[in-house]
């Protein structure tokens, strides 16, 4: 059975406050039956130097991605992962990670592809937990198999593909959440990160540039609903919004904001993102600070 929502007034203004928990709530419910805590970091070694008691590690690269095909794991693989991590289908899953929950939001988005009903983020993530000097451990919990059922992914509601993006150009909101250097075409990869093989630089025509990190404050918590509404005030209730970055990890954070904190009904994450678009043949690309227009073919 799902655990109760966090009643904190700091969350109540969001469209779906039940998708977030505070550190106080997690501390109070630690060890409760039906609670699964997951750490998913960009730096996959952080879990091993200390983590929230009872938390299991999910490696975004090796656990969530198919080892051969460039795609996510399938239903059988996800069920095996959940069994191995001791997570049941009806558990309340709280995910947290480093860097303002960047990769934690990615893991939550993948859980959503498989229809796990109750999955939440720890507001502020790992960094805030440590800043508040809350309890950590080196102990890795022993988990038993849960009999997690095989449920195949349902990509359509929240995942966009290249042809979906081509179909909405100049008709629906498209948001590029990457760094300014990536958006303008000055570089093909994130600053301070290695080159990943994109052949072209720039952005998709008509894409508005709103870096993902603008949705979080200095502590790593999400900004208030009022601040977020101002940031994304160009999105109308009936819009079909698509967000993208390089492989869908940063845009998962923006997807979470739009879907769960602002209550936008139709938001999809284009996880192929610039790794696909920047290598694709005959797709339109714009360089510079302006969104640009769709070229006439």
From Swiss-Prot:
The active site is at 245 (cysteine persulfide intermediate). Residues 31-138, 168-286 form the Rhodanese domain. It catalyses: thiosulfate + hydrogen cyanide = thiocyanate + sulfite + 2 H(+). It holds the Pfam family Rhodanese. Substrate binds at residue 250. Keywords: Repeat, Transferase. GO terms for molecular function: thiosulfate-cyanide sulfurtransferase activity. Its EC number is 2.8.1.1. Contains two rhodanese domains with different primary structures but with near identical secondary structure conformations suggesting a common evolutionary origin. Only the C-terminal rhodanese domain contains the catalytic cysteine residue. This is Putative thiosulfate sulfurtransferase SseA.
């Amino acid at each position: 059975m799902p655990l109760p929502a966090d009643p904190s007034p700091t969350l109540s203004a969001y469209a779906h406050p039940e998708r977030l928990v505070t550190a106080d709530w997690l501390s109070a419910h630690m060890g409760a039956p039906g609670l699964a805590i997951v750490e998913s970091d960009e730096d996959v070694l952080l879990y091993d130097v200390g983590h929230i008691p009872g938390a299991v590690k999910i490696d975004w690269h090796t656990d969530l991605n198919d080892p051969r095909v460039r795609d996510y794991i399938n239903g059988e693989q996800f069920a095996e992962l959940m069994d191995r991590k001791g997570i049941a289908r009806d558990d309340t899953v709280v995910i947290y990670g480093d860097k303002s929950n960047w990769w934690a939001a990615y893991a939550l988005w993948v859980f959503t592809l498989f229809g796990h009903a109750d999955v939440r983020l720890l507001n502020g993530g790992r960094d805030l937990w440590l800043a508040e000097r809350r309890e950590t451990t080196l102990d890795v919990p022993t988990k038993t198999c849960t009999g997690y059922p095989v449920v195949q992914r349902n990509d359509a509601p929240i995942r966009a593909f290249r042809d979906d993006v081509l179909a909405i150009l100049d008709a629906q909101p498209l948001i590029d959440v990457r760094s300014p250097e990536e958006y303008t075409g000055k570089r093909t990869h994130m600053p301070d990160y290695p080159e990943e093989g994109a052949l072209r630089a720039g952005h998709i025509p008509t894409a508005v540039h709103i870096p993902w990190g603008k949705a979080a404050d200095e502590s790593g918590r999400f900004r208030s609903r009022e601040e977020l509404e101002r940031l994304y005030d160009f999105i109308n209730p009936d819009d079909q919004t698509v967000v993208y970055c390089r492989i869908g990890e940063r845009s998962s954070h923006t997807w979470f904001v739009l879907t769960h904190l602002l209550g936008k009904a139709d938001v999809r994450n284009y996880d192929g993102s610039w790794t696909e678009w920047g290598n694709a043949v005959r797709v339109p690309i714009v360089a510079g600070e302006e969104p640009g227009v769709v070229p006439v073919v």
